C-alpha cells in the first residue's frame, strides 16, 4: 500500500490495505533524517480497544469553536498526501509560547488623510510636545505651517528637513506646542504623519485576543497615559476595517481604572488577510491639546473544522500516539500540532518534542494523529505522566487558526 494515496475515509483505506497484504506489516512509514528528525506518514486508525480521553476544558484565553460552518472561500492548499513530522526540543534554545500575546499598539503620534481642498484651507495639527516630526505624501507642494501665535514656518525656515526626504521635517522646538495649521497645494488626497518623539502622552491599544471567529466580538481596550498614569479623553472611537474595506465604528466607554473599552462585532466572510482596528482620540491634558491615532490587527477565522474534544491515546512501543476526532465542514488540508511535556527529577514539566501532522479532509467526522517516538522520549530524560500542550488546529488552505489550547491533554501515563 502506498501510504500517500489515502482514500477520503481512513477506515476504508485500512480495510483495503489489510485485504491486499498477505502478511501483517506496519500501517505507517517512518523516515529518519541523519540529524535525528523524523518524517512519519500518518497512521490510518487507532486501536479500537484503546481508551478514549477527553481534552481539558478550554481556558479563558484558549481558542475553541463550539460549532463548524461551511466557508464560501475556496481552499488553496496544494494537493498532497498525509504527512507528519516529529522533532525534539532543544531545552536551551527553544522559546515556546503556548499563548501568543495579542497584537498591541503604542504610539506618541497621529495620522490622517485629507483631500486637496482641506489642505488648501488648512489642516489642524495638535502638537503636545515641542520639536515634533511630521511627514506628508509626495503629492504636496508649497508646504507651510502656521504656528499657534500666527507665524508661518516653511522648509528651511522653522521646518528642519530630515535627511534627503523633501517632505519630512522637524518643527522648530522654539515654536512650542498647541494647535498648528498645515497648508499646501495638491491635486490628490494627502497622508499626514505626525510623531512626537519622547512625548509624555502615550496611547496604548490592545485587543483581548489575536484570533477571533466570525460572528464573535473583538474586545478592545485603550488608554491614554500621561507620565505613565491614565487620563480622561474628550473623544475616543475605534473603527474595525475588514479586508474588503467594510468598516464599523464604535465609541469606547471609560472604566473605573481609567481605561476605555469597546466591543466590535465581526461580521462577513473572512479570508487569510488580517482585520485592522484604527483608534483615534482627542484630549486636553494640563492645558495641552493631544491627538493620537493607533492601528492594530486581529486575525478572523471561520471554524471550518473543530476538535470534538476526544482523543484515543495508545503507547506503541512505549511511545505516545494520540488520535484526535474532528468535525469537518469544508474540504481543505488541515494541520494539527502539539508539544509533548514530561516531568524531570524535580517533578517539573518540561517540553520533550513537537509533533505535527496534516492531511486533506472532506466534510464529516475525521481524525488526525500525533505520534512521539519511544527513543525520542527516552533521550529527553523526562518521564511520565506526560501532557500535551499548545494544541493547534489550522485550516492550511484558508490560513485559519481553528483551535489553540495551552494545556490540552493529561495522558493516562
Enumerate the predicted regions with their spans.
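Short, aromatic- and glycine-rich surface loops/edge beta-strands on solvent-exposed regions
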Residues: 175-192, 270-287, 380-397
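Beta-sandwich interaction modules
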Residues: 115-126, 152-179, 187-197, 270-271, ...
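Aromatic sugar-binding surface patches on proteins
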Residues: 156-170, 176, 254-266, 362-376
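Beta-strand-rich structural segments
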Residues: 215-228, 240, 322-325
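Short, solvent-exposed loop/linker segments at the N-terminal edge
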Residues: 210-216, 313-317
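Surface-exposed beta-strand/loop patches in noncatalytic accessory domains
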Residues: 102-104, 109-110, 137-166
Amino acid at each position: 500500500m502506498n501510504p500517500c494515496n489515502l482514500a477520503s475515509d481512513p477506515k476504508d483505506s485500512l480495510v483495503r490495505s489489510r485485504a491486499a497484504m498477505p502478511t501483517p506489516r506496519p500501517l505507517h512509514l517512518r523516515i529518519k533524517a541523519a540529524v535525528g528528525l523524523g518524517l512519519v506518514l500518518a497512521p490510518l486508525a487507532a486501536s479500537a480497544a484503546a481508551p478514549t480521553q477527553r481534552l481539558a476544558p478550554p481556558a479563558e484565553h484558549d481558542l475553541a469553536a463550539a460549532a463548524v460552518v461551511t466557508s464560501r472561500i475556496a481552499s488553496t492548499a496544494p494537493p498532497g498526501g498525509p504527512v507528519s513530522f516529529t522533532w525534539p526540543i532543544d531545552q536551551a534554545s527553544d522559546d515556546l509560547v503556548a499563548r501568543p500575546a495579542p497584537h498591541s499598539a503604542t504610539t506618541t503620534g497621529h495620522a490622517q488623510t485629507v483631500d486637496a481642498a482641506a489642505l488648501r484651507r488648512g489642516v489642524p495639527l495638535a502638537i503636545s510636545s515641542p520639536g515634533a516630526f511630521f511627514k506628508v505624501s509626495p503629492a504636496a507642494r508649497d508646504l507651510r505651517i502656521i504656528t499657534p501665535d500666527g507665524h508661518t514656518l516653511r522648509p528651511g525656515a522653522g521646518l528642519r528637513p530630515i535627511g534627503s526626504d523633501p517632505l519630512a521635517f522637524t518643527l522648530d522646538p522654539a515654536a512650542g506646542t498647541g494647535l498648528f495649521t498645515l497648508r499646501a497645494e495638491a491635486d490628490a488626497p494627502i497622508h499626514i504623519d505626525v510623531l512626537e518623539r519622547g512625548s509624555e502622552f502615550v496611547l496604548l491599544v490592545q485587543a483581548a485576543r489575536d484570533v477571533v471567529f466570525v460572528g464573535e466580538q473583538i474586545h478592545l481596550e485603550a488608554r491614554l497615559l500621561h507620565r505613565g498614569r491614565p487620563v480622561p479623553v474628550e473623544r475616543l472611537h475605534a473603527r474595525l476595517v475588514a479586508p474588503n474595506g467594510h468598516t464599523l465604528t464604535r465609541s469606547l466607554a471609560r472604566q473605573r481604572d481609567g481605561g476605555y473599552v469597546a466591543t466590535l462585532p465581526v461580521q462577513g466572510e473572512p479570508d487569510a488577510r488580517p482585520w485592522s482596528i484604527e483608534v483615534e482620540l482627542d484630549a486636553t491634558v494640563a492645558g495641552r491639546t493631544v491627538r493620537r491615532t493607533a492601528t492594530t490587527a486581529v486575525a478572523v477565522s471561520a471554524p471550518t473544522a473543530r476538535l470534538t474534544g476526544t482523543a484515543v491515546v495508545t503507547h506503541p512501543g512505549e511511545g505516545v500516539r494520540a488520535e484526535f476526532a474532528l468535525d469537518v465542514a469544508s474540504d481543505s488540508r488541515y494541520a494539527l500540532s502539539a508539544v509533548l511535556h514530561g516531568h524531570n527529577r524535580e517533578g517539573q514539566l518540561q517540553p520533550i518534542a513537537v509533533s505535527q501532522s496534516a492531511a486533506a479532509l472532506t466534510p464529516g467526522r475525521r481524525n488526525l494523529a500525533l505520534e512521539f517516538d519511544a527513543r525520542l522520549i527516552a533521550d529527553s530524560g523526562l518521564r511520565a505522566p506526560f501532557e500535551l500542550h499548545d494544541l493547534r488546529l489550522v485550516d492550511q488552505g484558508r490560513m485559519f487558526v481553528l483551535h489553540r489550547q495551552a494545556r490540552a491533554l493529561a495522558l493516562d501515563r
